[in-house]
From Swiss-Prot:
Catalyzes carboxymethyl transfer from carboxy-S-adenosyl-L-methionine (Cx-SAM) to 5-hydroxyuridine (ho5U) to form 5-carboxymethoxyuridine (cmo5U) at position 34 in tRNAs. It catalyses: carboxy-S-adenosyl-L-methionine + 5-hydroxyuridine(34) in tRNA = 5-carboxymethoxyuridine(34) in tRNA + S-adenosyl-L-homocysteine + H(+). Belongs to the class I-like SAM-binding methyltransferase superfamily. CmoB family. This is tRNA U34 carboxymethyltransferase. The keyword tRNA processing applies. One of its GO terms (molecular function) is transferase activity, transferring alkyl or aryl (other than methyl) groups. Carboxy-S-adenosyl-L-methionine binds at residues 54, 68, 73, 92, 114-116, 161, 276. The keyword 4Fe-4S does not apply. It comes from Campylobacter fetus subsp. fetus (strain 82-40). Its EC number is 2.5.1.-. It holds the Pfam family Methyltransf_9. Keywords: Transferase, tRNA processing. Homotetramer. One of its GO terms (biological process) is tRNA wobble uridine modification. The lineage of its organism: Bacteria, Pseudomonadati, Campylobacterota, Epsilonproteobacteria, Campylobacterales.
Length: 282
């Protein structure tokens, strides 16, 4: 596997050289891992793997306090997830937090897709202790149609606005489903009643790779063009400082730095602040 640079190779070697610890795992809001014969080298390695965007994870008494309180999103989706004996994909899976949480729902298999090497390293580190059969592919959503299996359920959370051709992305998700399958997406949207799409000039919330933020009507149109037959809105919520915030486990800025300090209803660029819609497609 090409891990791109020597620093990543060294981290991968450190993960592979970890002892085969005996562990107990609890899937609460944090993925809690109680490690027998725990030593400080484990925490040193976790710190070397910063920034931790998704989580949290707890290794004995040490909380990896991720930027995102990802259990908020998962707990909102969980009542709609019927995963028992299903073949599941998590597209844009980051470090696998949602995949680990889905284990308790007894899917047949889980495959994560994310081209980020750091995400793969974090996943490999956590999975060394969890010892799951989750598979992580260093691939993106564009690789799904040519993947060797189809899926009953696909999660694609926080990805669509990072794609320069969102309709193509939705088509790729649709083509990767088994018959009767479903896709769960969450995406930022603009609160308007018409068929409107915001295309930021250069950045949105200081993020350069956000291309299109639709109104819900425009999002529905995209999904219909991708040949989805059903469009079920599960929830709508604002992103707030409880869900996304700066911690000692990340570098740089977080949501509080991305919004207008004089008006938190606006981004630093003057666009409407992030709102998210959660949708089930089939």
């Amino acid at each position: 596997m090409n891990l791109i640079n020597n620093a990543n190779k060294k981290l991968f070697e450190k993960i592979n050289n970890l002892k085969n610890y005996s562990c107990q795992v609890k899937f609460s809001d944090a993925i809690e891992i109680e490690i027998n014969d725990f030593d400080d080298n484990i925490i040193d390695l976790a710190k070397d793997l910063k920034p931790w965007r998704k989580g949290p994870f707890k290794l004995n008494a040490t909380l990896i306090d991720s930027e995102w309180q990802s259990f908020i999103k998962f707990n909102g989706l969980k009542p709609f997830l019927n995963l028992k004996d299903k073949i599941v994909a998590d597209v844009g899976c980051n470090n696998g937090y949602y995949m680990f949480k889905m284990l308790e729902l007894e899917p047949k298999s889980i495959v994560g897709f994310d081209p980020s090497v750091l995400s793969f390293l974090q996943f490999s580190f956590i999975n060394h202790f969890v010892k799951s059969n989750i598979k992580f592919e260093l691939l993106g959503v564009q690789d799904l149609p040519n993947y060797n299996i189809k899926f009953d359920t696909i999660l694609c959370l926080g990805v669509l606005y990072h794609r320069s051709d969102p309709i193509k992305t939705l088509k790729e998700l649709k083509s990767s489903l088994n018959k009767g399958g479903e896709v769960f997406i969450d995406t930022m949207f603009i609160q308007r009643d018409d068929e409107f799409v915001l295309s930021p000039k250069s950045t949105y919330s200081k993020i350069p790779n956000i291309y299109f933020i639709p109104s819900i009507k425009a999002l529905r149109n995209w999904c219909e063009r991708a040949k989805f037959k059903t469009f079920d809105i599960l929830s709508i919520k604002n992103t707030d400082f409880n869900e996304q915030r700066k911690t000692q486990w990340i570098y740089g800025e977080s949501l509080e730095n991305f919004l207008d300090p004089n008006d938190p209803k606006l981004t630093i660029e003057g666009y409407p602040a992030p709102k998210r819609v959660y949708v089930r497609l089939s």
